[in-house]
Amino acid sequence: MKPLIALVGRPNVGKSTLFNRILRQKSAIVDPTPGVTRDRHINPGEWQGKQFLLMDTGGYAPENDSLSVAMLDQTMRAIADADAIIFMVDARSGLTYLDLDIAKILKQTFSDKKIFFAINKVDNPQLALEAAAMVRSGFTEPYLISARDGGGVADMLDDILETLPCPESEDEELDDDSIKLAVLGRPNVGKSSLVNALLGTDRQIVSDVPGTTRDAIDSVLKRNGKEYILIDTAGLRKRTKIDPGIEYYSSLRTERAIERCQVALVLLDAQLGLESQDMKIIHMAIERKKGVLILVNKWDLVEKDSKTSKKFTDNLMMQLGNIGYIPIIFTSALTKKNCYRAIDTAAQIAINRRQKISTSNLNRFLQEALAMRHPASKSGKELKIKYMTQIEAGHPVFAFFCNDPQLLENNFKRFLEKRLRESFDFEGLPITMRFLRK
């Protein structure tokens, strides 16, 4: 499993800026207002060939300068699973009582974890001198960094990753032969009921109260000679509804469950249909190149006739738009209708996700596709695709070698993707297509 590094500190010390700097992308909203809430809290990163997960615990500020119960819940729970902690303070404002409170709690509550003390915003020599006097927090050898400019960040990362175990394989999904399925969805859509129906036991507390399950819990299911790891999680709530503490922490666990899985089973409530939070979960899985299967649960509660499922499917496909390649199964955890069919479908998606197609078969496909539809000319020039191949990545990635990638039209790219799905069964799988000059 990839080690998890948590960024901890009071609001506005630069956690989101460091988060973006380390990941080399603008994943977090950076705002001078203390306590700005981001949409994404945990992302995969890589440094010098070592892979890890980075978590920003920012986003919630106490109402005063003392470490409130809310701050404890929101931050301390969020780092409970972290392998290392970067405790950040601000060189410009110096150590505050809140910094010292956080330092005290980190040492008392997380003494078994590796804690790295980072003094941020050290942007000039004078601030470096002032920062040297800030070691009274109790952490030795602080790292003087500038998250904005990158100063000192590389050395700190080198030291952190030197102390952490590296994954045995590049992809933690491959640690064993089991198929890892994340059971995802908003609170009270029936995730735990589905897992219990599959396992034949009330392994978890099942209640009508949303969010009964708080942590990601792994269960083993054996079926038709295959072993499945079912990762059941608390549902993702809209940010405005996340209770300080436990629900915030559960959302982070959900995001980490997506990192671990091969296929995401996204449950919808048949009586509510597809909502914005469902789309967020689906897009989160697609961004991480996971397989996706939609389960419309509680189908037994819907009044229906012979056309109900088709109408529901047509409406859902219209809402999904360009990700309409995701299969849909109508289930009932209560009656067990289609529950095992969902598992068998997810297994096929996982197998297809790792399929390796020979270059000769791919180029035969390419010639047939080009015979069906020729690329449109652009500015008097014609796109010429010479050949294609599959890139080994653990999920479908294809490279197309052509005379000029800038001549590619989106319509033609969508045509090739659709033909790939039809020819090689990539249902439920995001496909990455790279067009390279040759």
Curated annotation (Swiss-Prot):
Gene Ontology process terms (BP): ribosome biogenesis
- Gene3D superfamilies per record: 3.30.300.20, P-loop containing nucleotide triphosphate hydrolases
Q: Which SUPFAM superfamilies does this one have?
A: P-loop containing nucleoside triphosphate hydrolases
Positions annotated to bind GTP 1:
9-16, 56-60, 120-123
The entry's GTP 2-binding residues are 185-192, 232-236, 297-300
GO molecular function per UniProt? GTP binding
Q: Which Pfam families match?
A: KH_dom-like (PF14714), MMR_HSR1 (PF01926)
Q: Which residues form the EngA-type G domain?
A: 3-168, 179-354
Q: Which residues form the KH-like domain?
A: 355-438
Q: Which InterPro entries match?
A: G_ENGA, GTP-bd, GTPase_Der, KH_dom-like, KH_dom-like_a/b, P-loop_NTPase, Small_GTP-bd
Source superkingdom: Bacteria
What UniProt keywords apply to this chain's record, in alphabetical order? GTP-binding, Nucleotide-binding, Repeat, Ribosome biogenesis
Q: Is Ligase found in the keyword set?
A: no
Per the record, the similarity remark reads: Belongs to the TRAFAC class TrmE-Era-EngA-EngB-Septin-like GTPase superfamily. EngA (Der) GTPase family.
Function text: GTPase that plays an essential role in the late steps of ribosome biogenesis.
Q: Which HAMAP family match?
A: GTPase_Der
Quaternary structure and partners? Associates with the 50S ribosomal subunit.
Q: Which PANTHER family match?
A: GTPASE DER
Q: What is this protein called?
A: GTPase Der
Organism expressing this protein natively: Chlorobaculum parvum (strain DSM 263 / NCIMB 8327) (Chlorobium vibrioforme subsp. thiosulfatophilum)
